């Protein structure tokens, strides 16, 4: 089975074509600047050949048409025609409370995605554009929707409810949803394999650390707590997001600075985090370099980030009543040995000790803990596209079996 995985953003469309026979990526591509001047599509195939093409991409449909051309190109393509693609898997950020798993796309699923537009106004609408374009260009090809929020639907009510009047939850769906679910699920499953235990018997803390960051407590293979909340703003300090703060700061700053609701939202989401503290950058590599040269604000930004992660690891150790492993993944989690060390230093009291030399190894799954550590620490590169492809394959094959078992 060949699965096309699509992640549509407001002005971009990422894609991978994965051969599920051996779970290998045949082609990886990106359409950028959709609806903007100087649009470009880039695609790299399994043998290293790379296509770069400047072209007009007014809409997501135009972008997907270019994807079709690239995948079937005589020189840079990897298939003869789109009929070789058996299914399409789409990433959708928000599924609300309606989806605890991925779902085969139909009119009901489409309505549910649109119902969540107000919960994820920056993400669900462009996700839907990608789905609609695909339905038009590849009619008859089954599509599976994989929701970022679905993995966290196993949280108990006392974990996902806020201590606000209950009717606000009933009327507006105000509760914790959590995000990065596909990544957290993937690395938790990999960690269980590295532990040599069935997922049902594990307690794992997964740390997805990138420009957007979240931490999840996974017990028995299920999410029981996560750091992001009603929106991805809650939780850790991030690249440009402030994370959890005293809510009273919001009206205080609106009054003192004369800010509108949109302006305070922009301040917290786009101008805060390590960028806001450092006044320099949201790129942790820049901050690492600046801090090493004595930039105090860059150092403070890194200290705040590491401290918040450390607190959540301790908190989730309590939630799980002890953890078997802590996992680091995503851009920072996988690649920054210095930030991992900042986070993990001083956690020997809860059984975490790391080997400094192992911690410096990059680009592979590795146990960086010392032999005598009670809690294993794994660095596991995430692969959300493969996770989406696996979900897509499973759901499509299950649906085919169900249909074939129904008597005519």
From Swiss-Prot:
Subcellular location: Cytoplasm
Enzyme class: transferase
GO biological process, one term: acetyl-CoA biosynthetic process
One function term, GO molecular function aspect: acetate kinase activity
Keyword Thylakoid: no
Residues that bind substrate: 91
Effect of mutating residue 91 to A/L: Decreases catalytic activity. Decreases affinity for acetate
Catalytic activity annotation: acetate + ATP = acetyl phosphate + ADP
Main location: cytoplasm
Outcome of substituting residue 12 to T: Decreases catalytic activity. Strongly decreases affinity for acetate
Pfam families associated with the record: Acetate_kinase
Gene Ontology cellular component terms for the protein in this record: cytoplasm
Stored HAMAP family: Acetate_kinase (MF_00020)
Job of this protein: Catalyzes the formation of acetyl phosphate from acetate and ATP. Can also catalyze the reverse reaction. Can also phosphorylate propionate, but has very low activity toward butyrate.
Protein name per its UniProtKB record: Acetate kinase
Species classification: Archaea, Methanobacteriati, Methanobacteriota, Stenosarchaea group, Methanomicrobia
